[in-house]
């Protein structure tokens, strides 16, 4: 069974960076790009960026280039997204999602989501 597991919640103080995790299982981890998407309350989905687990290559939404850093740990089949200097505007649900680039080219598996609350 393909799964992407994420922590349920993260409470972050403004300006304090946070590292979000996405643990994959049930498939060959290095065969699919992993992307990160967020949804702020009452807003639509925003694509943040993606990472190639096989070589660490990344692709970012210009809006998040100075905000998010994607990394990978092949030994634990996990990807990470560090959010730097978060503000209340970064309070959102953050999802990882697997990209099916060889099939229909869409996000075919989604993580459980991490609710990030930025508050002092």
From Swiss-Prot:
Annotated Gene Ontology cellular component terms: extracellular region; immunoglobulin complex
Annotated keywords: Adaptive immunity, Disulfide bond, Immunity, Immunoglobulin
Region described as V segment: 1-98
Cysteine pairings via disulfide bonds: 22-96
Signal peptide annotation: none
SMART domains with a match to the protein in the record: IG (SM00409), IGv (SM00406)
Listed transmembrane segments: none
Region of interest (J segment), ranges: 106-120
GO molecular function: antigen binding
CDD domains: IgV_H
Protein name, UniProt field: Ig heavy chain V region AC38 15.3
Lineage: Eukaryota, Metazoa, Chordata, Craniata, Vertebrata
């Amino acid at each position: 069974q393909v799964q992407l597991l994420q922590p349920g919640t993260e409470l972050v103080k403004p300006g304090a960076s946070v590292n979000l995790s996405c643990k994959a299982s049930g498939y060959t981890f290095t065969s699919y790009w992993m992307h990160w998407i967020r949804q702020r309350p009452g807003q639509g989905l925003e694509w943040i960026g993606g990472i190639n687990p096989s070589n660490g290559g990344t692709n970012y939404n210009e809006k998040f280039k100075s905000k998010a850093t994607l990394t990978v740990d092949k030994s634990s089949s996990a990807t990470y997204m560090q959010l730097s200097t978060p503000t209340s505007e970064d309070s959102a649900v953050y999802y990882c999602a697997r990209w099916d680039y060889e099939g229909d080219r869409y996000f075919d598996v989604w993580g459980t989501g991490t609710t990030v609350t930025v508050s002092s």
